[in-house]
Design a protein with these regions (language model features):
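A glycine- and charged-residue-rich anion-binding loop/surface
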Residues: 1-903
């Protein structure tokens, strides 16, 4: 069987047993707490939690079967966070950053008997894996661990092995919570699991195989895990049965396909198994071999340093094959290389691949050439790869060009640090490589390990923390204070926010906070929005005991209290102790709040339009909304064209005119509408707030918004620029700010129209005519200048003096620029043949000198650099250069003629 046939036979086997074949979900997970989709069950979590009824037959792209049974092959990435295989990839034959997880699921339908018996039927009956080589693990709790022996699974396996003519006592192995009990988290659904292990020793000795189960030996590995979700873990540490029991299984596709290839169809176990033997990697290996003119021989190093030449080559082949698959699939799912979170992980993987490409001698620009073989091998099952091939290649090209500009210099820095001795790369050098040259720490560690060196990670982390502290200090609104000594954030009560429905309210002062020169009031409740999620804090006024206090900003502390910053020109505040408990009337500056809300709602529309025009890979990377403008940072791999910006702006204003309602409501995170955008790294509780504009734009958001889209009035894009590799920034204005922006533009256009004596519609055409005329005049002027310069060169050459076989010209000459003076000097020297030319010209308040020496003049001891240095000094300046050409000058313009005459 080919790898593709193994995959398809798995899906067909379960489809024939009533399972709906669902497409792989995106590598961009729905849960903001996950870096990447890292298991087949991720997309089914809401069903397991009871937040969504089983309805898989209705899912887009599904091959329908039962709603309560599903099967698929899921793209997974494990690189970064808890699951991080990155540093091992390449050095063995079974680690990957990206892999496929084959799986089947039951949602309150069949349970252990069907799951285990079908699994056995597939791997022994359909695929032909020798039954004698298989072992099953069953949960047996250790001291203090939950539940009891999974007697049900044990009995099922006993029957399976007995019917196969095998001794169940030899082939069933028990494991504790670490190996055979699955938990989604500290609380929630959980249950025992049963794994199938495959003995890959050259002989099929049962006792030897049994000893290797769960021993971490690559000659006896787990190939399929069956998880039986039957309990709920409670907060008090107890476990209670679930009303509906589920099955969740997972099988590593590359692992099974690799074993099949390594063992010639599960028949020859003489060779070491390798996932990379699977033919799914063959197109990539062929392309790498063609590019590098080297051959993959499947060697595996015993250690990280002192590799043979062939081991180095084979490690690089495996790294490139794995990383090309990972980065291609990530970009296809909208995860672009970047500087934070999951985007930074993808950038690290890509740069690690580029570094290994250099080890194979591959030229800059090679990585994008690995996309075609990825599409060839994975495109039929993951069609988004073929559909987005061009985007994938363009992103890779830009990343490789960007990193290539600093890679060589960074390698030089590393080489110097390595040569300095001491047994370790200093943390300062590792930080410089990271901060200046874009080397992730693990890349520096990799380079160091190859030389038998360590990296001073403690010093590296210290410098990283210093940088983070500097960044925090630069943020104007980072207010972290405690109310009184001895209190912590946990002791303080968050402020009750009323501002979604009110712009004025009554409250009581509960604290006065002083932070340097700034004074903040804290109330028990407030209509003032505190800066959060990029939205500026509210301003307004607080009336306390008949005194009006201006509130110029509102921020939040760690306890969730709203801190109302008071303006500088205020009535004297009573002592803090006397102020606590005082009644207050709070009023938000409503026009200012409305302006901010317009910009916030406009930001949501802009995000929607960007994804519509540029693609769903666009993701918010940062945002700021003020009364005056909005700023939106987003992931994208190239500059947005003028035509694209026009279309984005048109779509946004089209939706403004359509005047859809802007609805906000709270729901449980796992029950939010499909397609609602959440942002990785943001902290979401169980209850979240959804902002829905017309059903087409849905985001989790805690900010304030307009009631209908038409309240935004108008949106105008002001600028688009790059702020980092893979990250763009758009600045725009909305509402009155947009109207003012248009008015300024119209005023400027009217002024230009008046100067050109042309109507606004004719300005562009009139300018094109004037520019064309100007260019023609410049061409004619340049021609005249060249003729004049040639004549001047003749005149200067004719006045040369001769000495010792050389000709000399020292003169003040007319030239319109230093470049023209140099050109004139070159012309004069060409006419002299062998000699020295020194020319000077005043430009404003500075005299400029150029000197040129022919080869014979240099041979005779004349040097342009020394001449210019001496003459410039006389003019009160300095200069120098090479023996054949130099430029300098000084500010004593009056001495120019005298200086050249003396020379």
């Amino acid at each position: 069987m080919t790898s593709a046939e193994i995959r398809q036979s798995f899906l067909d086997f379960f489809a024939a047993r009533g399972h709906t074949v669902v497409p792989s979900s995106s590598l961009l997970p729905d849960s903001p707490g996950l870096l990447f989709t890292n298991a087949g069950m991720n997309q089914f979590v809401p069903i397991f939690l009871g937040d969504r009824r089983p309805d898989v037959s209705t899912w887009a792209g599904a091959r329908p079967g039962s709603d309560t049974r599903a099967t698929d092959t899921q793209k997974c990435i494990r690189a970064g966070g808890k699951h991080n295989d990155l540093e091992d990839v390449g050095f063995d034959t079974y680690h990957h950053t990206m892999f496929e997880m084959l799986g089947n699921w039951s949602f309150g339908d069949y349970f252990k008997k069907e799951s285990l018996e079908w699994g056995w039927e597939l791997i022994t009956g359909v695929w032909g894996i020798p039954a004698r080589r298989l072992f099953a693990t069953v949960y047996r709790p250790g001291a203090g661990e939950p539940s009891e022996l999974d007697q049900e699974a044990h009995a099922i396996w006993t029957g399976i092995f007995a019917r196969a003519g095998l001794d169940p006592a030899r082939h069933i192995v028990t494991g504790n919570k670490k190996d055979n009990f699955w938990m989604m988290g500290d609380t929630g659904p959980c249950g025992p699991c049963s794994e199938i292990h495959f003995n890959l020793l050259p002989d099929d000795d049962e006792a030897a195989g049994r000893r290797l189960v769960n021993a971490g030996n690559p000659r006896c590995i787990e190939i399929w895990n069956h998880v039986f979700i039957q309990f709920n873990a409670n907060a008090d540490g107890s476990f209670s049965p679930l009303a509906a029991k589920h099955v969740d299984t997972g099988m590593g596709f590359e692992r099974v396909a690799g074993i099949h290839a390594s063992t010639r169809g599960f028949t020859d176990f003489s060779r070491d198994p390798s996932n990379y033997a699977a033919d799914v990697f063959a197109p990539l290996f062929a392309r790498i071999a063609a590019l590098s003119r080297k051959t993959y021989q499947a060697t595996v190093p015993a250690r990280r340093e002192g590799l043979t030449a062939q081991e180095d080559i084979d490690v690089a082949f495996r790294v490139l094959a794995d990383h090309a698959r990972c980065v291609s699939c990530a970009i296809a799912d909208g995860i672009l290389p970047g500087n934070e979170g999951r985007n930074y992980v993808i950038r690290r993987i890509l740069r690690r691949g580029i570094l290994y490409g250099q080890k194979l001698g591959l030229a800059n620009g090679f990585f994008e050439q690995l996309v075609d073989p990825v599409v060839a091998s994975l495109g039929p099952v993951f069609p988004e790869l073929g559909q987005r091939r061009d985007i994938i290649q363009r992103v890779m090209r830009g990343e490789e060009e960007s990193f290539g500009r600093t890679l060589e210099r960074g390698l030089q820095i590393f080489a110097r640090a390595a040569a300095a001795g001491g047994g370790a790369i200093p943390g300062a050098a590792a930080f410089e490589l990271y901060d200046t040259y874009g080397f992730p720490l693990d890349m520096t560690q990799l380079l160091a390990a190859e030389r038998g060196l360590a990296v001073d990670t403690a010093e590296f982390e210290r410098r990283m923390e210093e940088q983070r502290q500097r960044g925090r200090a630069a943020l104007r609104k980072e207010v972290v204070v405690a109310a009184t000594a001895g209190e912590t954030a946990a002791d303080l009560t968050p402020t009750k926010f009323l501002g979604y429905t009110a712009t004025s309210a009554h409250g009581r002062v509960i604290d006065v906070v002083e932070s340097g020169p700034d004074v903040f009031l804290v109330f028990d409740q407030t209509p003032f929005y505190a800066e959060m999620g990029g939205q500026a804090g509210d301003a307004g006024a607080a009336l306390i005991d008949g005194h009006a206090y201006a509130v110029v900003d509102t921020v939040k502390d760690k306890a969730g209290r709203h801190l109302h910053k008071l303006g500088p020109a205020l009535p004297a505040l009573p002592p803090a102790a006397g102020l606590r408990g005082a009644a207050a009337t709070l009023a938000v500056d409503v026009p200012r709040r409305r302006a901010i809300s317009r910009h916030h709602s406009a930001t949501h529309l802009l995000h929607w339009a960007l994804r519509k025009v540029l693609g769903t890979h666009v993701r918010q990377a940062g945002t700021h909304k003020t009364p005056e403008r909005l700023r939106f940072d987003f992931s994208h791999f190239e500059a947005v064209t003028h035509a694209q910006l026009q279309e984005i702006e048109r779509l946004v204003n089209e939706k403004v005119i359509d005047n859809a309602r802007v609805e906000t409501y709270e729901t449980e995170f796992d029950k939010k509408p499909e397609g609602t955008l959440a942002f990785f790294g943001d902290k979401y509780g169980r209850i979240v707030r959804v902002v829905d504009i017309g059903g087409y734009s849905r985001e989790l958001c805690g900010g304030t918004h307009v009631g209908t889209a038409a309240e935004i009035a108008l949106v105008k894009i002001v600028s688009e620029s790059a702020i980092a590799a893979g990250t763009r920034r758009i600045e725009a204005v909305a509402g009155q700010a947009a109207i003012d922006f248009v008015a300024v533009r119209e005023s400027a256009l009217a002024a230009v129209s008046a100067h050109l004596s042309a109507g606004p519609a004719d300005v562009a055409r009139k300018l094109e005519t004037l520019i064309a005329h100007q260019r023609e005049l410049e061409r004619q002027l340049k021609s005249f200048q060249q003729k004049a310069s040639a004549g001047l060169a003749d005149s200067l050459a004719a006045g040369a003096t001769a000495r010792a076989g050389l000709k000399f010209v020292y003169a003040v000459a007319a030239a319109e620029s230093p470049e023209a003076l140099r050109s004139l000097g070159s012309q004069v020297l060409a006419k002299l043949g062998e000699g020295v030319v020194v020319l000077g010209t005043p430009f404003g308040d500075k005299a400029t000198i150029v000197a040129l020496c022919s080869p014979a003049a240099i041979q005779a001891g004349h040097q342009a650099g020394k001449l210019v240095a001496a003459l410039s000094a006389k003019l009160g300046g300095r200069g120098g250069g090479k023996p054949d050409y130099a430029m300098g000058g000084g500010r004593d313009v009056a001495k120019l003629a005298e200086t050249l005459t003396e020379a």
